[in-house]
Design a protein with these regions (language model features):
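Bacterial N-terminal signal peptides that target proteins for export
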Residues: 2-13
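Hydrophobic core
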Residues: 14, 18-22
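Residue-level detector of conserved, function-critical positions
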Residues: 35, 39-544
Length: 544
């Protein structure tokens, strides 16, 4: 049923064209250190007005620059490893298979290279592991470093792709693996590699770059270059990488097969690159190794991708499936609208008013007032409480802020003025803020904006934005009782969503005066820097 055998290419490995200069432009340790555009030592030698003791955990974190595209700061524990100028790009690399974050990647200006740019891979000590004399974007998968050229069409089969646009290196051995000619993207799938390739075949190139997928092919090969699968007029995505879920099965790939003219998708399937099983009708990956498929007769199936041997259908619904946690599924009623929560063990069905997905949690608010948060990996109920619907309820907003915490806004109007705002948590917290008191406190400067920031010690904290003197925006941090914890901040928000290695509980991103960084609930800096620090370029010219 809906399964196709993996195409075995009965020919020798596809001829690979690797330019001789590739290996020369890339080298693994030992390496001279990259030119530190903004040496971390300068910041370390400067007087500190912060205490980073709570960060001493050996984990990599990134502080994005204040109001600039570049200029980020990389820390390992309480140690600053790199502070970039505004012209340097830097980011953490999380291995999408292991979930570990042990490296960071930087790209900066270097007039000594042909491209005028250089990039490098660095470990948790700040040591350079790899140096490249060209600009690349990087991803890490099962210890393989996948490099792609950062052009505007890097993930598309445009006509100007060339050898070297995609490179794959094994960090354990330093070996560069074979890559097909004209590859434009690559994802790891189990022990194999899947490539998107520019392959025009007999098609006449369209110089306007329209209908690009008539020139695209998917090729899967062993690490030695032996080709095991080929699909012309197709594109490939990694289930694990595209969902940002380290627990997702890593050997399944989404294959989108296009019409011959590249105008439409004829079929979307999931392919197991290890076993060769291919299942058509793919709709969406949900969680805990389970995905949604549409059958040939139009029903929607929950399919376990991790079952032994081959995938297994768990159950079917007439309506589309929007969310899943072990033991429950949420469907959307096509005919009447609205959601339903299905207990897969008892068969009970609960009408749902709203749902919200967090990083690994599912929150639902039922029409009878039941509010629950499920762990999407285990199915455990983290929060189970009741918030009575208000009289004349028109709509709701449900915000899942992870860890079992959820924030519910109810409206008795159609003009987006919040009527009630309730915070619920895993420790039994169920508190409705006194919005009238908050409005009275801030007067005309308050525009009704409250946003979740952080949780600590069984309490949840939100930010209130309002206009202060000179019409400048200011932010107060309040608890779930509406009490002001910190006042007059220049900014106040949670650490970046889905970021590896979160900050300690009760630590958030803030600006106060000219200082910007990570602050605790006492208003003490855990780490901070001047907001103008990241506004300089490589030559230390500053832009304000």
């Amino acid at each position: 049923m809906m399964k196709q055998n993996l195409l075995r290419v009965g020919c020798a490995a596809l001829s690979l064209s690797m330019a001789a200069g590739l290996l020369a432009s890339c080298s693994v340790l030992p390496q001279p250190s990259a030119p530190a555009s903004r040496p971390a030592q300068r910041e370390q030698d400067a007087p500190k007005n912060y205490d980073a003791a709570s960060l001493k955990d050996g984990k990599l974190r990134i502080l994005y620059s204040y109001n600039a595209p570049g200029g980020n700061t990389i820390l390992c524990g309480d140690t600053v490893l790199r502070q970039s100028p505004i012209t340097e790009t830097s980011y953490l690399l999380t291995d999408c298979i292991t979930g570990e974050t042990n490296y960071y990647f930087c790209q900066w200006s270097d007039n000594s290279t042909a491209s005028g740019r250089r990039c490098g891979l660095f470990d948790k000590t700040g040591a350079e592991v790899l140096s490249l004399e060209a600009p690349y974007d990087a991803a890490l998968s099962g210890g393989l470093l996948i490099l792609t050229t950062p052009t505007s069409f890097a993930d598309s089969p445009v006509h100007d792709h060339a050898p070297g646009d995609v490179r794959v290196l094994d960090l354990a051995t330093g070996e560069e693996l074979p890559v097909p000619e004209n590859a434009y993207t690559c994802v790891a799938a189990g022990d194999r590699l899947a490539f998107g390739i520019y392959a025009p075949g007999d098609a006449v190139p369209d110089e306007e770059n329209d209908d690009l997928y008539q020139y695209s092919a998917v090729q899967i090969q062993e690490r030695d270059g032996t080709v095991v699968y080929r699909n012309d007029h197709a594109a490939v995505l990694s289930v694990a990488l595209s969902n940002g879920d380290a627990s997702a099965p890593t050997d399944w790939l989404e294959i989108d097969t296009y019409s011959d003219d590249g105008m439409s998708i004829e079929q979307t399937s999931l392919l197991n690159a290890t076993t060769g099983e291919e299942r058509s009708g793919f709709v969406v990956y949900l969680s805990a190794g389970v995905a949604s498929f549409q059958s040939e007769n139009g029903t929607y199936q929950l399919v376990d991708l991790t079952s032994t041997g081959q995938s297994e259908v768990l159950c079917e619904f007439e309506d589309s499936i929007s969310a899943y946690a072990p033991g429950v599924a949420v469907t959307y009623r096509q005919d009447l609208g609205g959601y339903e929560l299905h207990d897969l063990n008892t068969g009970d069905v609960l009408e749902v008013r709203d749902e919200s997905l967090g990083t690994d949690t599912l929150a639902v608010y039922a029409k009878d007032g039941a509010l629950r948060v499920y762990d999407q990996n285990t199915g455990a109920v983290l929060t189970d409480t009741v918030v009575t619907p208000i009289e004349g309820l028109q709509r709701t907003d449900l915000y899942n802020v992870d860890g079992g915490w959820v924030w519910l806004r109810q409206y008795d109007n159609d003009y987006y003025e919040v009527t009630t705002s309730t915070v619920c948590g895993p420790n039994g917290t169920n508190k409705t803020l006194d919005l009238d008191a908050i409005k009275a406190r801030y007067g005309a400067g308050f525009h009704g904006y409250l946003w979740p920031v952080t949780a600590a010690g069984g309490e949840f904290y939100l930010s209130v934005s309002y206009q202060g003197p000179g019409q400048n925006w200011l932010y107060d941090l309040i608890d779930s009782n509406g009490n002001v914890v910190l006042a007059g901040l220049g900014s106040c928000n949670g650490y970046y969503t889905n970021t590896a290695n979160p900050l300690p509980d009760g630590v958030f991103v803030a600006r106060k005066g000219f200082e910007y960084g990570w602050m605790d609930l006492h208003g003490q800096w855990i780490y901070c820097q001047n907001i103008f620090y990241s506004s300089g370029d490589d030559a230390e010219n500053y832009y304000f």
